[in-house]
Each structure stands twice: as C-alpha cells, then as structure tokens.
C-alpha cells in the first residue's frame, strides 16, 4: 500500500525530507516516506480547527457511531495491521494478533460507549433565583504525539477519548514506527468528516515542534520520554496549553518471603520482558526479601534464560528485537555500566546477540544496590535487576525513592500488608500478585516525573474535556 498523510480528509504525500523506516529484526530499510512540511502541518491544524465548529457540536451518538466504524474496520483488517506492526517494530506477530489488536479494538468500542455517558456532576439552585449547571465540553484541537513502543495501541489510547469527547485531532506517530498509524489514516478518511482526524509523519524537531507550538492547538497529549515531555512543556508554556503527559516508568516489583515464588518468577518472565521490555510498566526493578532472595534469583535466572528470541513471524518467538539501532546502543550502554560494578552479578544475558537485527539477550542482574543507575534509571529493554531488602519499611522507602511513579506490584499472601503498601506506594497503579494487567474501564497514568493525566477509563475521557459552569437567572 501507499503510505500517505491525512490532511483535511485527503491522503497526500509529504512535502518534506524523506526518512527511512527500518525493520528492526533485520536492520534493513522497509521504505522511505516524506515528512510533512511546515505548510502541511499548518494545513492540518487549520483543517482540525475548522472542523471543530461542527464536530464539537455533534451528538455523542454520532461520534460513537464513527468510533465503532473505525473499531470494526481495524478488526476487519487485523492481520494486515498486525503484520505491519510486527514488521516495523519487531514484535512477535502472534503477540500483536492475540494481545494488541483486540485491546486496540476494545479501546475504541469502550470510548464509543463512554461518549454517551459523559455528563456534568451538578445542577441546582445554589443562589436564590438562579439555576446552575455543569457542562463538560470539548477543548478544541488536540495535538497527539504517539511513541514507538506500541504505535497503534498508543494512537488508539489518544484518539479514542479525544474524538469521543468532541475534539479534533492532529496525531504524529513516531518517525521510527509510523506504518500502522498511516494505515489507520487510510481507513479513517472515509469514516470521519474532513479535518476531524489528521495524521502527519515526521521527526519531532521538524514536525512535532511546529505542531505542538501551533497557535490553534489547544491541548498536547504525549506518550514519550521525560526529556521529550520537558521539551514540549517548555515549548508550549508561553501559550499555556493544556497538556497530558505519560513519560515512562521504573516499576518496583516487591516480593515478600510469603509470596508464591513460582508465580512471581513467571510473572517477571512475562511482565518484565513483554515487547522486549519496551514498556513503561515493565516489571524491571525487583525487590526480594532476604529470606527468599537466593531462591528467587535462581528461579528468575531459569525463567529468564528460557525466553526464546527469534524472528517475529515465528510462532514460538517470545522476545523480538529492540525498535532501533539507537535504542540498542542505549540499552547496551546501560547494561555495560551496570556490569562494570564489582557487586553486580550477571545471572543471564547481558549483551547484544550476534547476527542481524537489533536483538539484546534477556538479562537478569542480581545484587543491585538502591543507588545503582540500573535501579534508578529506565532502561526500556529486556533487562531486570534484583535487590535484596529486609523489611516492609525499607522496601517501601526504596520503592518510592524514584523519580518515576507509573506502576508497581506487591507479591504477598498477607492481605493486610498488600493493602498497607498499596496505600503508600507513590505510583499510579499497584497490582497485587500480578503485574501489567490493563483494561479499558480502569485508568492508566502516573505521578511524579512519569507525568499526569489518565489514559483509558472515564477519567481518560474527562481529561479531554473542559469543565464549565452555566448559570441562568429566573
């Protein structure tokens, strides 16, 4: 298929510099795509601003019908989407088909229903002779920046609530992994009125900055790194735009001596290495109580070393490559820094694999200390550290000693302990005896430098609205 931008309901070629898109499993170029020019970014935003006058006044039913049509279209083209995502990201094809595509379809269907349930919280006479009511209205033009780790899923998380609430959107996928977003554009063209949804392609410095800084953009939604979030906040601060930030994580996984160690080890094997560890909620920072530390290290070593790396199209592949050569170099540097510490033990993995593609072996680093960079910084790869702790107070202090605040988990059979820690952990989500589980009905989002705002759930829908007070004198 031809990959084009969607601007004002028309598929067009980019007018900017051409960029190569790679297959990370082979390191080979898939194709080249031209970026949007500044004039095309301007045209997309102006089209969205013009379309908002009508789209923002449509009924929730009408918006829901469009979202349902898009969900149906994605479902009908599931295999093509999955193949594109697998080819462009290196994800195991069966994971995209069985895990990601159904979740993406569900997000659009959830927000189609949620659009029809959005309402204000109060109506009444709070002043004699006056009736007050609360409205939740759309914001206007939303600029959405999607990341490279889950390109289509993160696009869905941003598009569905924004469109459901009555906003118009200009979305820019990562220049590393744009193919599924551009495929989505081709489907959306015949579903939404012109200008309601616009899809651009390009780098942050050439397209993203022009988009987020445009005077007609009222809100910017980003999933990305802390550095990118800081840049966008500085860039948009003079205009005081509404912002929604999901900026990564370093999830603590606290395993107490009464936990089911087999379940914990298998949980980390699955939840720490899914998508090659390129997940903001990955179970990557393990704390094990002293009494079970050695046993858990052994179980984790066996579990992690059994992960099968391979070609994305192979049904038995559990771990694919990292998304880019640049990211492979970042992960390698982080692990080499950890390995240089005399107290770190490499239980398994620890290096790039031989051969083509951007593969890094699943890695378990034992005896990490709280102050180590491998514990404090997000690696965003198939790398898990494990640290011993003595008691509840110590591990709570260590778990919260992080600039991140997205996700965490506690593994214990003590219900009281689970409740105590979940109440005090400074994370947007805490799982008990599991990790990584997300559903459309529940909010996902962080605190501290992991950002603010919620994806999914009714809270996510509300983030794309303005609360307004209307008062009538009578």
UniProtKB/Swiss-Prot annotation:
Domain of life according to the entry: Bacteria
InterPro entries: Ald_DH/histidinol_DH, Ald_DH_C, Ald_DH_CS_GLU, Ald_DH_N, Aldehyde_DH_dom, Aminobutyraldehyde_DH, PatD
Positions of transmembrane segments: none
Pathway: Amine and polyamine degradation; putrescine degradation; 4-aminobutanoate from 4-aminobutanal: step 1/1; Amino-acid degradation
EC numbers for this chain: 1.2.1.19, 1.2.1.-
Record-listed NAD(+) binding positions: 146-148, 172-175, 209, 225-228, 280
Summary of subunit composition and partner proteins: Homotetramer.
Protein's name according to its UniProt entry: Gamma-aminobutyraldehyde dehydrogenase
Organism: Salmonella choleraesuis (strain SC-B67)
Lineage start: Bacteria, Pseudomonadati, Pseudomonadota, Gammaproteobacteria, Enterobacterales
Gene coding for it: patD
């Amino acid at each position: 298929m031809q990959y084009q931008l969607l601007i004002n309901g028309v598929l067009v070629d980019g007018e900017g510099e051409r960029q190569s898109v790679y297959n990370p499993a082979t390191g080979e170029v898939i194709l080249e795509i031209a970026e949007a020019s500044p004039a095309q970014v301007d045209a997309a935003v102006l089209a969205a601003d013009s379309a908002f006058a009508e789209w923002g006044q449509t009924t929730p039913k009408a918006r829901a019908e469009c979202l349902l049509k898009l969900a149906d279209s994605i479902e009908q083209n599931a295999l093509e989407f999955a193949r594109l995502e697998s080819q462009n990201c290196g994800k195991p094809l069966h994971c995209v088909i069985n895990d990601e595509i159904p979740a993406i379809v569900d997000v659009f269907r959830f927000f189609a229903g949620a659009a029809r349930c959005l309402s204000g919280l109060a109506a009444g006479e709070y002043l004699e002779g006056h009736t007050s009511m609360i409205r939740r209205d759309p914001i206007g033009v939303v600029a959405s920046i999607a990341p490279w780790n889950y390109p289509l899923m993160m696009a869905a998380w941003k598009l569905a609530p924004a469109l459901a609430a009555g906003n118009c959107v200009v979305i820019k996928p990562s220049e590393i992994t744009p193919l599924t977003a551009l495929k989505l554009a081709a489907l959306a063209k015949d579903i939404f009125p012109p200008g309601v949804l616009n899809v651009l392609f390009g780098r942050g410095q050439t397209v993203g900055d022009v988009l987020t800084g445009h005077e007609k953009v009222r809100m910017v939604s980003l999933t990305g790194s802390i550095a990118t979030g800081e840049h966008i906040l500085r860039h948009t601060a003079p205009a005081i735009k509404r912002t929604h930030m999901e900026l990564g994580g370093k999830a603590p996984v606290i395993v107490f001596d009464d936990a089911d160690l087999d379940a914990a080890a298998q949980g980390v094997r699955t939840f720490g290495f899914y998508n090659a560890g390129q997940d903001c909620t990955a179970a990557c920072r393990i704390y094990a109580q002293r009494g079970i530390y050695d046993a858990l290290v052994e179980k984790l070593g066996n579990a992690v070393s059994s992960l099968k790396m391979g070609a994305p199209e192979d049904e038995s592949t559990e771990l694919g490559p990292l998304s880019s050569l640049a990211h492979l170099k970042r992960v390698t540097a982080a692990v080499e820094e950890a390995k240089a510490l005399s107290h770190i033990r490499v239980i398994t993995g620890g290096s790039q694999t031989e051969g083509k593609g951007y593969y890094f072996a699943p890695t378990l680093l034992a005896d990490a200390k709280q102050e180590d960079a491998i514990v404090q910084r997000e690696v965003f790869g198939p790398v898990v550290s494990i640290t011993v702790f003595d008691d509840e107070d110590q591990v709570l202090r260590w778990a919260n000693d992080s600039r991140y605040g997205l996700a965490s988990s506690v593994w214990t059979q003590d219900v009281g302990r689970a409740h105590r820690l979940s109440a005090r952990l400074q994370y947007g989500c805490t799982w008990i005896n599991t990790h990584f589980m997300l559903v459309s009905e529940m909010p996902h989002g962080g605190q501290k430098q992991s950002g603010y705002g919620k994806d999914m759930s009714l809270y996510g829908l509300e983030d794309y609205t303005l609360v307004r007070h209307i008062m009538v004198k009578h």
